[in-house]
Amino acid sequence: MDDSTHAAEAVIATPAGDRTVRFETGRLAKQAAGSAVAYLGDTMVLSATTVSKQPKEQLDFFPLTVDVEERMYAAGRIPGSFFRREGRPSEDAILTCRLIDRPLRPSFAKGLRNEIQVVATVLALDPDTLYDVVAINAASASTTLSGLPFTGPIGATRVGFVDGEWIAFPTHAELARATFDMVVAGRVIEDGSDVAIMMVEAEATPGTVELLAHGAPAPTEEVVAAGLEAAKPAIRELCRAQSELAALAAKPAREFPVFIDYHDDVLDALSAAIGDELSAALRIPGKAERENELDRVRQLAAEKVASQFEGREKEIGAAYRALTKKLVRSRIVTESVRIDGRSTTEIRALSAEVDYIPRVHGSALFERGETQILGVTTLAMLRMEQTVDTLNPDRTKRYMHNYNFPPYSTGETGRVGSPKRREIGHGALAERALLPVLPSREEFPYAIRQVSEALGSNGSTSMGSVCASTLSLLNAGVPLKAPVAGIAMGLIHADDSYVTLTDILGAEDAYGDMDFKVAGTRDFVTALQLDTKLDGIPASVLAAALQQARGARLAILDVMAEAIGSPDEMSAHAPRVISVKIPVDKIGEVIGPKGKMINQIQADSGAEITVEDDGTIYIGAVDGPSAESARSAINAIANPQMPEVGERYLGTIVKITNFGAFVSLTPGRDGLLHVSKLKTLSGGKRVEKVEDVLTVGQKLQVEITEIDSRGKISLSPSAEAADAAAAAS
């Protein structure tokens, strides 16, 4: 290490042993405003923070961009794309971008308008660890070192609930035994007395239900709250190490222009001019009526104060939004009444309906107030699993959840097309909420695609998607281990008090301080996500919000149970998938030379066949008889039973000789129909040429008359075949 390179370490004690996160700066990416490398084991992530020289004064938002670059060489792999190089970011990379952005964004000075970009590049990946939390810490370190107006550092850790204990930075092997997996980011408050939570992303694991069946403790609200507390020591240690590094190598704090949205004189003038009318408009319960009245009041505000503040129209708009926010929050804090007249714990009107769309495999419509979600389920053969080219160990996805948010869902116009980061994030959250209750591949050998269409939006379409998806999956006949529902919680912070809101509206999300989404079954939490505009929230406040969310979740589950209480019969339009297990050494025989045998079975039966390396064969067809026909053919090859004299088969003529015809009874097993036995097919007359009565490819009902010591089979036409020939003549 040369003199310009500095390092600091965070050592986190866990029940499974110490975990060491190492930070370095001064060696790589020296031209960036701030750069840092974070290590966890052999995982190495470089983060570089840069800032534009000039601010974007015209913007009314903070232009922060976070990018995560997954380099396949980090895992010793070549990208699987046609050009063999990295292309657009993977879903994992996009989700990690969101994990970094969410705690970083509220930590910058308000009013900053210089473009800031944070780029985290995964240079090496330890096969035992996930890189996302390493990237969050690296991004915080590089930004802390950059001299920007940033109230960091921020520490982030993953904690897994393994064997009844919370373990920081768990390995993949430990996560396989965990019932809950949680990423927590936070900062040490100014007096150093506590850690404030800034971001949470968590879910039950796919193996949770099975682990619970073997006695593992469930991830209840109390357990999850304890996990937030368990994350605090690790966050504190990570922040300490970053502060130590900053003391050695941080650039001097730089002055950046801060653009105030409005001045107090504009706010005071607006309050005097339209304060009462705005307050009355905000008390209208219906969204459409409220929005119409608010548009009128907004126009009135511009007319009344525009002449006083000529050239400051942008300030008028910002002050109007600030006054609206102030009135909404004040009513909640002082009256415990919200925009639409509900109490702080009240849920909007609920509606659930299944089997809404014809011909699809499963569908449901879920409504909560003006939020309306259509869920649609499609089932397919396992070969339709999604192949993912990513650094994480999972290479395929059997359950795929896609979320769509068209502009008409909010009554607006806008771009439609490929999903944006928000849509990808919402789909991933709903996917994680449902993964723990999905049946295993063995129990339900189907690839499942779930699509959530946000047809109307006024608060938490992602949690509405969880509810609609549960209903749709049950309607499709998917045997879920338990139904899952979700609810979004909000928070208003005034002075030293916190008011928690159940089932927040879109406006309450915009004007509040927290968006806390919680999904789960009746017995445990399956997923949660926290975003906050504050510098942090006490863990005790989040624990209380979890308990408040549970009551709402149970009420929603009751409504869903009235719509559908158990899995329906599978749709007649869904494929039928069955399985058969064969010895591994028989796989080659089933496939045949150049796939001849398996292709023949598929052609004869009309089924689609997928062969797994362990000898499991999945057979999919449009109906049950076709699938059973393919299974019988496979069993005849790989799990054969010796035929017996007297058994009858619908065989196929495969070869004709001068002494008879060879008939295929099952794949790989033929019998001889001697020419002397063909009299019954020619009205009792002697047959001179076999070709006169039989042709290759002809189907014929035959009966086994003899099996000799060498296993050779002799056949004769069955009585049904003779009768059919007589009738034809």
From Swiss-Prot:
Xref: SUPFAM superfamilies: Eukaryotic type KH-domain (KH-domain type I) (SSF54791), Nucleic acid-binding proteins (SSF50249), Polynucleotide phosphorylase/guanosine pentaphosphate synthase (PNPase/GPSI), domain 3 (SSF46915), Ribonuclease PH domain 2-like (SSF55666), Ribosomal protein S5 domain 2-like (SSF54211)
The answer, when asked if RNA-binding is one of the entry's keywords, is: yes
Zinc as a keyword? no
UniProt-listed PROSITE patterns? KH_TYPE_1, S1
Residues annotated as domain S1 motif: 646-718
Q: Which reaction does it catalyse?
A: RNA(n+1) + phosphate = RNA(n) + a ribonucleoside 5'-diphosphate
Question: Which cofactors is this protein said to need?
Answer: Mg(2+)
The record's annotation in InterPro entries points to:
ExoRNase_PH_dom1, ExoRNase_PH_dom2_sf, GPSI/PNP, KH_dom, KH_dom_type_1, KH_dom_type_1_sf, NA-bd_OB-fold, PNPase
**Cellular compartments per GO CC:** cytosol
Indicate where this protein resides in the cell. Cytoplasm
- Every copy of the KH domain together lies at 575-634
Q: Which UniProt keywords apply?
A: Cytoplasm, Magnesium, Metal-binding, Nucleotidyltransferase, RNA-binding, Transferase
Q: Which NCBIfam families match?
A: polynuc_phos (TIGR03591), pppGpp_PNP (TIGR02696), PRK11824.1 (NF008805)
Q: Which family does it belong to?
A: Belongs to the polyribonucleotide nucleotidyltransferase family.
Role description: Involved in mRNA degradation. Catalyzes the phosphorolysis of single-stranded polyribonucleotides processively in the 3'- to 5'-direction.
Full protein name: Polyribonucleotide nucleotidyltransferase
Organism, per UniProt?
Frankia casuarinae (strain DSM 45818 / CECT 9043 / HFP020203 / CcI3)
